[in-house]
């Protein structure tokens, strides 16, 4: 199974975060992060997205409880050996500690010098890769995601169209597959 570390910046946008986590919960890949990544997510939800502190903390707890094995330990001692951008070395160290082959990030440029066997991918590239492997499971996860939304209610098509903002290639593939159903 594909093992990926999710950078904090792919956990900020609600629809993208929810999609990645639901696809992971469907067994399409194994998601990992570190406590520091979740702290960065929480901090940015407060400062950039204006989320109330209690809601941001509740979200972090829900994520941790939904994925109890996702938190990576032992990355701290690896961080000094990483050679990518200093502010994102902790993400690469978490990937090494998790045995991940992929880092999913919206900030590819800071991951140009990572250890062999690890590749940084945008959410669009990553979701497209996952979709190519198991389109049925991904579409089922997205359909369940759309069905869970109430305010506003979204159809599967509408959800995929909104995902096109962060993942246009994936959205195009998913819409084509949806039309073929």
Predicted regions and their residues:
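PIN-domain endoribonuclease scaffold, especially VapC-family toxins
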Residues: 32-75, 142-167
């Amino acid at each position: 199974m594909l093992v990926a570390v999710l950078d904090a910046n792919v956990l900020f946008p609600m629809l993208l975060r929810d999609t990645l986590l639901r696809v992971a919960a469907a067994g399409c890949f194994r998601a990992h992060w570190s406590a520091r990544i979740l702290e960065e997510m929480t901090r940015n939800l407060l400062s950039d997205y204006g989320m109330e502190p209690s809601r941001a903390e509740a979200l972090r707890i829900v994520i941790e409880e939904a994925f109890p094995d996702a938190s990576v330990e032992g990355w701290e001692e690896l961080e000094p050996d990483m050679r990518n951008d200093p502010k994102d070395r902790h993400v690469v160290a978490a990937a090494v500690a998790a045995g991940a082959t992929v880092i999913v990030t919206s900030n590819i440029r800071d991951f140009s010098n990572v250890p062999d066997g690890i590749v940084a991918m945008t959410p669009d590239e990553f979701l497209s890769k996952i979709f190519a492997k198991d389109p049925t499971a991904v579409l089922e996860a997205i359909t369940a995601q759309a069905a869970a939304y109430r305010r506003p209610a979204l159809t599967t098509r509408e959800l995929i169209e909104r995902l096109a903002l962060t993942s246009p290639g994936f959205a195009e593939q998913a819409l084509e597959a949806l039309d073929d159903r």
